[in-house]
């Protein structure tokens, strides 16, 4: 089983069309990885599906970096 960090990085790479090695924990989805607002919505939806969780809009707005996504998932695992 992959770690949460590995799974998040894989999803980010797939959703944003970047190489997995470019996805490091400090990267911002918008500033560093070229995401637009639609990309970030789709990214949150992919995270919800992968980790079987629901991310409220007010929380989704705070998930702007790879590390923030990892932290959110870790904090909300069943």
Curated annotation (Swiss-Prot):
Q: Does the keyword Phosphoprotein apply?
A: yes
Note the PROSITE patterns from the entry: CARRIER, PHOSPHOPANTETHEINE
Record keyword Cell membrane present = no
One GO molecular function term of this record is: acyl binding
- Segments spanning the bilayer are none
Q: Which residues carry this modification: O-(pantetheine 4'-phosphoryl)serine?
A: 37
> Which processes are annotated in GO (biological process)?
lipid A biosynthetic process
Modifications after synthesis and translation: 4'-phosphopantetheine is transferred from CoA to a specific serine of apo-ACP by AcpS. This modification is essential for activity because fatty acids are bound in thioester linkage to the sulfhydryl of the prosthetic group.
Domain of life of the organism encoding this protein:
Bacteria
Q: Which residues form the Carrier domain?
A: 2-77
Q: Which InterPro entries match?
A: ACP, ACP-like_sf, PP-bd_ACP, Ppantetheine_attach_site
What pathway does the UniProt record associate with this protein? Answer: Lipid metabolism; fatty acid biosynthesis
Which keywords, in A-to-Z order, does the entry hold? Answer: Cytoplasm, Fatty acid biosynthesis, Fatty acid metabolism, Lipid biosynthesis, Lipid metabolism, Phosphopantetheine, Phosphoprotein
Q: Which Pfam families match?
A: PP-binding
Q: Name one GO cellular component term.
A: membrane
Q: Where in the cell is it found?
A: Cytoplasm
Entries under PANTHER family matching the protein = ACYL CARRIER PROTEIN (PTHR20863), CARRIER DOMAIN-CONTAINING PROTEIN (PTHR20863:SF76)
Function, in words: Carrier of the growing fatty acid chain in fatty acid biosynthesis.
Database matches in HAMAP family: Acyl_carrier
Family named by the database record: Belongs to the acyl carrier protein (ACP) family.
Report what the protein is called: Acyl carrier protein
Classification from the root reads:
Bacteria, Pseudomonadati, Pseudomonadota, Gammaproteobacteria, Pseudomonadales
């Amino acid at each position: 089983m992959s770690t949460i960090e590995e799974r998040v990085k894989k999803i980010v790479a797939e959703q944003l069309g970047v190489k997995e090695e470019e996805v490091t924990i400090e990267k911002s989805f918008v500033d560093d990885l070229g995401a637009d607002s639609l990309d970030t919505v789709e990214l949150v939806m992919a995270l919800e599906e992968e980790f079987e969780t629901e991310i409220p809009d007010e929380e989704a707005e705070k998930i702007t970096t790879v590390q923030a996504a990892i932290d959110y998932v870790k904090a909300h695992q069943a």
